[in-house]
Amino acid sequence: EMQRSLVGSEMCIRDSSQTVPVTVTAFDPEANLALLRLKNEADAAFLDKLVPVTLGNAPRLGDKVTFWQFNDDGLPITTSGTLLATESSSPFTNSEPFVLYNVKSSVTPLKGGAGNPIMRDNKLVALSASCDPSAQKALAVTHTMISRFLQQARSGNYTGFPADGTQVTELTDPVFRKFLGLPETGGGFYVVKLPVYGSFYKAGVRPGDVVESVNGIPLDSKGLIRDPALGPVSANVLFRDSAMPGDIITLGIRRKGKDGVSQPMTLDVKLDRSALEGDLVNPSPFIANP
């Protein structure tokens, strides 16, 4: 358990009064993830009292998982659950949503409900984000997000997840598709508006464009991709959850011409966080290394 104060950050064991100072090497308030290290080498023995866990394989729909919690005496409390689907949500800050796991479980959070490990075969596969025991529903930070966070955090230069700020709508209405000059069948999402300082706009995407694919992966008419392990998933996972600032993605788009015909084209987008950094009020002002 980590405790923060004006003096600094400390880590303690639930069933012990011992605390040690730690340094926060990377912190992401959007994803509620942090990477810590001991501040003093002399406290290395403190870690011997902890049980390490490893990051397991990414779960699939239908997999059984276990929520781990610990009471004030350090005793474990476990609750089972089943991964049912994914859901786009931003539970920690008022920023762009992530793709989170939707887990059916009656887990009742002891403190806050966020940050508790979710295990499968005694390996970490997710972290709790929010719990609703009455609905038997829990949202969880995904394996993809944890892996991506650790990969960048270990590099020593953590900058956060890409954010573009583009607002889109689905293309399920056949009348709307006809108005846009699109084929009767097909997929994609319609770009309603986007910030001029965002990565999509800087790459040439404009309001009225239809994004049909990302890196060659087709989107359905709701703007979803078909993930082999998770089923229908928001395309955001390709340019936010699993990506890093500086990554380049290729968008397959259609743009309606003056003749009313929608023409296909491709655009390469260099992902960044300029949509947040350009806002007058930044919802996540402390995304960089503390």
Descriptions of predicted regions:
Residues K39-V51, P76-A140, E184-V192:
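Active-site region of chymotrypsin-like
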Residues E1-G8, C12-I13:
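Single conserved hydrophobic/aromatic residue that forms the stacking wall/gate
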Residues H143, K202, S213-G252:
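PDZ domains, with a preference for the canonical peptide-binding region formed by the helix
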Residues V107-P117, T169-S213, I217-D220, P290:
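PDZ/PDZ-like domain segments forming the peptide/carboxylate-binding groove
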Residues A42-F46, V51-L55, L61, K222-G223, ...:
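C-terminal, low-ordered peptide segments at domain boundaries
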Residues E10, R14, V53-I77:
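Short glycine/Trp-rich loop-beta-loop segment that forms part of the substrate-binding cleft
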Residues E10, R14-A42, F70, R240, ...:
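Conserved catalytic-core segment of clan PA serine endopeptidases
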Residues R148-Y190, D272-P290:
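PDZ/PDZ-like peptide-tail recognition elements
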